[in-house]
């Protein structure tokens, strides 16, 4: 039995604990729907999430910050659409599943797998954190629909169709135009493939959330037409607030809401605030670090946590301040205005580029709640944003399942 399979069985057990000290002022439950993990997660001692780590999300930071649950991401980068590329993607995905399994097996007294909304809520009531497994980039299925069933059996409950660069499911909001991929919304943007359509159909049957973050506008529109259940965007912003292709336009915010879904606003600096000076300075720093390490290009999985990177980013911050919680609130308020309070949620993209002034890591999660209150959101609204909406959508997706 695999680590994830053992954990899936273990997750149904109940342990009764004490609610956090801050329970009275915290929302009923807080869920961050996008947290990345490095490939060496739970293998390299410095990425042992049960200890104090350089990661933006570890168990201690979640506990101190009042973050009750996180969608931990099985992400793989985009390679070629050939047998070698698919094999590499499948192998890289296995690394992530194994890492999450190690986390859950090593710290069952602190965090449990949640494969249903009910398990997530039960974990919280028992004083435990929850891990939900989320696939980012359906390319890791290796162009084999049966791997979606295998992922479900291992605990995955969300399938992100695309990432950066077009894959075999659909076109991306950030295609690889340098290597000839057509720009989003151009005549060459083909949207969904037959394999992508099959993945959505099977995800509906299994009761998996269909995640359209990173997908092209055309892909999102077709996903909305094809899916028999609500769809969601695990980590996206509002294009009307910042014109970035990774952000969703108002018509798609409305369409996802009309389908009964939810869009989780992402706290990723470049999707919140345009700062060409900072972006150029960061790129220069990355190139310098790659050169120092003898690498052809910067490897965020290895290099993001180097002392030299920390020092360099501190200098950049002095000249080019990060996006702030106020910038983040601007996106949330616009998304609520367009989609409605029942169709917006919260995501950090921590350890995948996320992190802003005021919400720099999971230990600062309560700052988000305070900022929402400052913007005039009621306690009932905050409860919806922090997890109520996501749990509703997840339940609806499960009810529509045929497995």
What residues fall within each predicted segment?
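Bacterial N-terminal signal peptides
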Residues: 8-20
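Bacterial N-terminal signal peptides that target proteins for export
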Residues: 1-9
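N-terminal hydrophobic targeting/anchoring segments and the immediately downstream early-domain regions
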Residues: 22-185, 243-403
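Divalent metal-binding pocket/active-site signature
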Residues: 142, 153-232, 237-246
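Serine/proline-rich low-complexity intrinsically disordered segments, especially terminal tails, linkers
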Residues: 14-16, 116, 218
């Amino acid at each position: 039995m695999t680590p994830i399979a053992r954990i899936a069985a273990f997750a149904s057990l109940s342990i009764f604990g004490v609610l956090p000290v801050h329970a009275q002022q915290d929302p009923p439950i807080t869920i961050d729907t996008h947290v990345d993990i490095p490939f060496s997660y739970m293998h390299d001692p410095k990425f042992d999430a049960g200890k104090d780590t350089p990661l933006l999300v570890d168990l201690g930071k979640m506990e101190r910050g009042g973050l009750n649950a996180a969608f931990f991401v099985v992400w793989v980068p985009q390679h070629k659409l050939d047998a070698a590329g698919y094999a590499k993607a499948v192998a890289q995905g296995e690394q992530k599943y194994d890492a999450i399994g190690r986390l859950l097996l090593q710290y069952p007294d602190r965090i449990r797998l949640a494969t249903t909304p009910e398990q997530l809520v039960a974990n919280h009531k028992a004083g435990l954190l929850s891990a939900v497994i989320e696939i980012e980039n359906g390319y890791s299925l290796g162009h084999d629909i049966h791997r979606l069933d295998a992922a479900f059996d291992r605990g995955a409950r969300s399938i992100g169709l695309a990432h950066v660069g077009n894959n075999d499911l659909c076109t991306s909001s950030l295609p690889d135009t340098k290597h000839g991929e057509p720009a989003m919304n151009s005549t060459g943007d083909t949207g969904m493939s037959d394999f992508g359509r099959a993945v959505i159909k099977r995800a509906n049957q299994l009761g998996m959330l269909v995640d359209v973050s990173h997908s092209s506008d055309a892909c999102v529109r077709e996903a909305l037409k094809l899916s028999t259940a609500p769809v969601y965007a695990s980590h996206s912003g509002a294009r009307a607030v910042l014109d970035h292709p990774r952000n969703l336009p108002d018509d798609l915010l409305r369409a996802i809401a009309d389908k009964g879904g939810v869009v989780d606003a992402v706290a990723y600096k470049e999707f919140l605030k345009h700062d060409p000076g900072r972006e150029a300075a960061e790129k220069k720093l990355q190139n310098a670090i790659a050169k120092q390490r003898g690498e052809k290009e910067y490897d965020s999985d290895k290099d993001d946590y180097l002392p030299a990177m920390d020092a360099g980013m501190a200098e950049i911050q002095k000249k080019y301040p990060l996006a702030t919680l106020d910038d983040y609130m601007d996106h949330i308020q616009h998304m609520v205005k367009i989609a409605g309070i029942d169709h917006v949620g919260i995501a950090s993209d921590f350890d995948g580029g996320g992190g802003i002034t005021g919400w720099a890591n999971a230990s600062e999660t309560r700052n988000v709640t305070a900022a929402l209150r400052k913007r005039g959101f009621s306690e009932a609204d905050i409860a919806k944003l922090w997890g109520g909406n996501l749990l509703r959508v997840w339940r609806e997706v499960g009810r529509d399942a045929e497995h």
